[in-house]
Structures are given as C-alpha cells and as structure tokens.
Amino acid sequence: MIPAPIFSGTFFIVLGISFLAAVSVVLWIVALVLFPPVRRSFRAYRRRSTAIFAALCVTSSFVVAMVAIGLQAEANIRKEEAAKHPALVKSERLLGIDMPPGTRLSLSTAGDMNSIEKAEFPHAVDVYGIAAVALTVGTEFDDEAPRNDRDLATLTALTLTTTGPRTIDGWTCGSKAPLKIVLRNDARTRTLWSCHLADGNRVAGGVVPAGSRVMRSTTTYGDGMRDNDYWEIRVAEDDVFELSSLPLRHAELRLDRERTVLAFDYATLARAASVGNIAYPAGTEVTFGVRGLREDYPGAWRFRTPGRQHAVDKNTGPIADGASVVQAPSGKVYAIFPGRTD
C-alpha cells in the first residue's frame, strides 16, 4: 500500500485562502465601525462593496467551519474527560469499598462507575482493613491457580497509598511507597502482593532492613517445575541482611509460606567473613538453595570469590583466585571448583 497524506497540498492552499478571507472580513468590519470615510466609501459603492464582502464571507466560511469543528471536538473531549474524572457528591460503595463524598475517581469508560482505575479519598478510608488515602486498580496473574497457558487466571489488584505502617499477612509494610494487595474468592479474601517493608520484620533470625521489598513470587521453570517458594524479599540497596553470621548485600531471598529461607542468589558479602576454616573476602558471591546446587549439595552454600581475590583456608592456605567453594553452614567443604564455573 502506498502511503498517502491525510491532507493534500490543495487542502492547505484552500485553507490559507479561506483564512486570508476571514482576516479581511474582520478587518473590513473593524474599519467600517471605526472609520467614517470607510463607511462613506462603502455606501458610495454599495453594490460592488456588498458583492466583494459577500464573496469574502463565502470564502472564509471554510476556515470558520474548520474552527467550529475544532472547538466542538475540543468541547467533546473536555466533556468526556470530565465524565472520566468525576467526584462523588454522596457516599457510594464501589469495588466493595465505602467511598465518601469528595472522592475523586478516574474511570476507563466515561460514566461507568465499575471501570475505576484510580480513586483519591478526601481522608483515610478503610480498604479491606487497610487505611488508605488513594488506590489504583490493576490485575495480577494468579500463580496459585492451576497453570493453563491458554487462559491465565487473573486477580484484581489494588495499589494503596497508606497513612502509616500496616501489618498485612504478618509483614509490616511502610508508607513511603504504595503497597499492593490482591482480592481472591470474589473479593472475600485479600492478601498482600507486594510492599516495601518498615522496621521490625525478621527472617531466619535476622532483621530485614527497612525499605526492602517483599512480594508474592513462586519460581516456575521452563520445564513446568515449580518451587515451593511463596515470598521473595529483595534486600534494600546498600543495606546488609545478616543470615547465619553472613553479612549479605543485594540478596534476593526466596521464602516459603512459613518464611523459611529456601534459596537466595545475587548476594555478596558486605565484609570479610569466615565459615569453618575458610575466610572469604568482601565482595564474594554467595548462593544457596538454587536449582542444581540443592540437588547435588542439599543445604550447602556456594561461595565464588571476586576475580583476583581468593579465599584462605587456615589449614592449607590460599584457594585459587575466583574459585567456587561449596560448603555447609557447619563448615564442611563439599567441593572446590577452579575458575568461575557455574
């Protein structure tokens, strides 16, 4: 298909001529009102002046019509936008929430109160047991439903702006960032989907730094296998999470429903640390419980030292630069792999 412009050159020529005619009509009217000589000249040559004026009016009608159409379109857009952003004048129950007067809504379909995308409340409102001043409506895939690639089940997700820390499903969420909940069983049940944690959360005996993000996550592999993890915690940037005396930075922890740590990866040692007889330098990568490692060495950690640095065994001395050491928390060494093998 050969692309063609929406408006041809002829259209713009006609539009330009019509615009000049409209300007001429306006200037002529102004001159007739302000200057007596112009009025006398118009009366002296009434027939010719009237014909020219009429011709200019007809010629200018095209641009006048275009302006009128544009103004009407703009008015329609403003009207539709206003209909998409109503403010409640009385209390209404929407999305299972009692919304007070003054609530400002954003709708995806004008006039359809069931198509809410956002809501801003004049004061804190109880949203499924959580005090919130605003919400955004979305969807999330239900990873607890039976897997069906042709028809993935979805859940209604509400992203809430809260007024202070809130404890949900055992996690204390902060208010510096929105938290997200999902509605299950026809909105009879609400569960936490994700939030940034406040102070006071603990995992495996360690304090999770405030600002870390917790989210619902179940690891699924390409072959269809699914792990038993239920939560994922991404430790706050530049903060340290202490796990079994290991000072971990950048850790991504995978937990089961009871918050037992099943696996973590992408972690590095924030400072030098020792396990059994081996001392590892800061920056050493630490992995636990990932697929492949857990089958061959259940419960073991894998340490990979940074390039040009090495771990030191107090009995045998330095271990080769960049080597990987598979070691139990008790200190038992299962294997040492040279280089940076996976």
Where are these regions (language model features)?
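Short low-polarity hydrophobic stretches
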Residues: 23-30, 56-62, 190, 262
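Internal/C-terminal transmembrane anchor helices
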Residues: 45-73
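Membrane-embedded alpha-helical segments of integral membrane proteins
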Residues: 1-40
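Transmembrane-cytosolic junction motif
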Residues: 35-43, 72-76
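Glycine/tyrosine- and acidic-biased, solvent-exposed loop/turn segments at the edges of beta-strands
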Residues: 16-19, 65-342
